[in-house]
Swiss-Prot record:
Binds ribosomal protein uS19. The PRC barrel domain binds ribosomal protein uS19. Belongs to the RimM family. An accessory protein needed during the final step in the assembly of 30S ribosomal subunit, possibly for assembly of the head region. Essential for efficient processing of 16S rRNA. May be needed both before and after RbfA during the maturation of 16S rRNA. It has affinity for free ribosomal 30S subunits but not for 70S ribosomes. Gene3D superfamilies: PRC-barrel domain (2.30.30.240), RimM (2.40.30.60). This is Ribosome maturation factor RimM. Keywords: Chaperone, Cytoplasm, Ribosome biogenesis, rRNA processing. GO terms for biological process: ribosomal small subunit biogenesis; rRNA processing. One of its GO terms (cellular component) is ribosome. The keyword Chaperone applies. It comes from Acetivibrio thermocellus (strain ATCC 27405 / DSM 1237 / JCM 9322 / NBRC 103400 / NCIMB 10682 / NRRL B-4536 / VPI 7372) (Clostridium thermocellum). It is found in: Cytoplasm.
Length: 174
């Protein structure tokens, strides 16, 4: 499993004292309130700079962060388009049968008769339930509702998901 998780993306500065505006990449933006520090980088690597978090505010759909050592707008500007990254061990504990999206991406998806449907490439948040985007071997996209009645098994050891598709969800050409 992935060692680091992206929990936000810095999209702009906020004010003149070095604060940044971040889009939360988590279902629970309040999780930022408990963070003491985070990595800030354009990509996950072994050499990501680590910043102490001085303050956290919530404004509309954004999180306003103040990092130690980032004290003016020019310094904050350099963090635009960077991700706020945490260690997996610092992540919130998920309820049973709930998964981090990054752990599902790349998973092989099969129907209950062991026919491979494709590879999970994305997860769409629709409000009522998530939808898994599965790309078949012939490049067709299958949209699968992330419901307990549909998703029968998720096995990270085998990198495999088994789904029981509702009648008519896909055509026979997949």
């Amino acid at each position: 499993m992935i060692q680091y998780l992206q929990v936000g993306k810095i999209v702009n500065t906020h004010g003149i004292k070095g604060e940044v505006k971040a889009i939360p990449l988590t279902d629970n933006p309040r999780r930022f309130n408990k963070l003491k520090w985070a990595y800030v980088s354009k990509e996950i690597s072994n050499e990501m700079p680590k910043f102490d978090i001085v303050s956290v505010k919530h404004h509309k759909n954004f999180v306003i962060l103040k990092f130690s050592g980032i004290d003016d707008m020019n310094a904050a500007e350099k963090l635009k388009e960077h991700f706020v990254i945490i260690d997996r061990k610092d992540a919130v504990k998920l309820p049973k049968d709930t998964f981090f999206i990054c752990d599902l991406i790349g998973m092989n998806v099969f129907d209950t008769e062991e026919k491979k449907l494709g590879v999970l490439t994305d997860v769409l948040s629709t409000g009522s339930n998530d939808v898994y985007v599965v790309k078949s071997d012939n490049n067709k996209e299958i949209l699968i509702p992330a419901l307990k009645s549909v998703v029968k098994k998720v096995c990270f050891e085998d990198n495999k998901m088994v789904v029981d598709l509702p009648q008519g969800l896909i055509d026979d050409e997949v």
